[in-house]
Amino acid sequence: MRQADSQTQPSPAEQETPQPAGPSNRSPPTMGPQQTGSRKRKAAEVDQGAGTSSSPGPAAPMATAGEGNAEGSMLLTKRPRRPVAHLSMVNYLKGRALGADGHPGLAGFEGDLRSYGVLRLPELLRERQLTLGPLNKVFASQWLNARQVVCGTKCNTLFVVDVKTDHIMRIPLMRDRVPDLSRGPPSCGIHAVELNPSKTLLATGGENPNSLAVYQLPTLDPVCLGDCQGHRDWIFAIAWMSDTVAVSGSRDGTVALWKVDPDMFNGSIAWHKDAGLPVYAHISPTDMEAIPKATTNPGNRKVRALAFSNKNQELGAVSLDGYFHLWKARSSLSRLLSLRLPYCRENVCLTYCDEFSLYAVGSQSHVSFLDLRQGQQNIPPLCSREGGTGVRSLSVHQHIVTVGTGHGSLLFYDIRAQKFLEERSAANPDMFPVPSGRKLKLTCGSGWINQDDLLENYVAGVEDFPNALYTHCYNWPEMKLFVGGGPLASGLHGNYAGLWS
């Protein structure tokens, strides 16, 4: 998820075309010769009219009759006034109410309003915690519509929550065609939930976290399961390259390309007569690529996050060995480069910024910006030290980066200004708020935690267990933010979900 800095607009007076000077009761010019007036006064009037015109007009023909004072009149063609674009809030709202989509200046004004809203929204957000019951750690989330968010958890639960009523609807997970009976209950959970560009398909993990599951929207009927010749370990990341092509990254160090055939949709809504379960196809990847082994840490090349650039048709990935990888993504994947990241500990999140053609990588203490067009990092990394707990979720919209930390807070960074957004305050209620110099930080609530885990694993009396914010997603049309997470410590069972609006 480029806006140029807004420039000063000319005033209405500057946009209008001045008319030739002269008395208002002046008689209109005629074609016949006129004998009144002197030559000098006539010349002065011509000079004055030429000097006050904003742009040169057609030459005024002069007809002369006889000698001496006899001369023709100058024909001045009156220029039509240009329409004035009034860039005011009142005119904008009037035009929008009347459906004036093509009104001059409205498109640019709407862009300025959106940019201003993105910049000012964080300081206006207020939290309402959602109740999720005993679910453990929300790892992934996406808005389905204005009221519903679909989430995946560490306890391998896929559910939809209504942010107005807190109602939870669980979604059945798809099972492999040949279940692995030797594999115990999954301890990985669902790390990725992604919608295709048209929001008609949802990709996530299956009951086996090694498999890719695709559901149809808005019904959430199962479409297909990628469990054939695919990943051998947990899926950590998913990205859509088009409406029918998805790519997944796994802990086994591979990236897989999946083609979802639209013909599957009709068959997926049929039902088994005996089991009462929906039918879905079982598919294989069309291409698989292995992450190259690093010389420094060859055993830890797990793919942790993916991001797709639709503009460049390129796929970026980060692996836990501290490398960033880039592929050209067409019908297959062709690797372009692999480079060592400047901050290589706990690289667990990645996003692409269309506004600046940048990849942003979250690590233990920094967010690094990669501009691959320049072959260098020309935007300094931002430091997000929050108790050493690292960056756990990351998103970019226009020029604002939202950072979810492992210490229960949200930070906001302006790429244009290359600084964090600041709190705004006023000396008294009658004054306009101004930046205070303090970093704007939204601190999330306590959520829910299993008290039995506290008694078994931690010292009694310790109450400060902030939630790691593993996921967040915006609903920009309604200016809402969903945030999910849970305790950072692996031995603690709990969850956090909040609606910020």
UniProtKB/Swiss-Prot annotation:
Disordered: annotated segments: 1-67
Lineage: Eukaryota, Metazoa, Chordata, Craniata, Vertebrata
Matching PROSITE patterns: WD_REPEATS_2, WD_REPEATS_REGION
Residues spanning the signal sequence: none
Protein name per Swiss-Prot or TrEMBL: DDB1- and CUL4-associated factor 12-like protein 1
Protein family membership: Belongs to the WD repeat DCAF12 family.
SMART domains attached to this UniProt entry: WD40
Organism: Mus musculus
Keywords, in A-Z order: Repeat, WD repeat
Polar residues: bias regions: 1-37
Keyword Repeat set for record: yes
Disulfide cysteine pairs (residue numbers): none
Any single Pfam family the record assigns to this protein: Beta-prop_DCAF12
WD repeat start and end residues: 185-225, 230-268, 298-337, 384-423
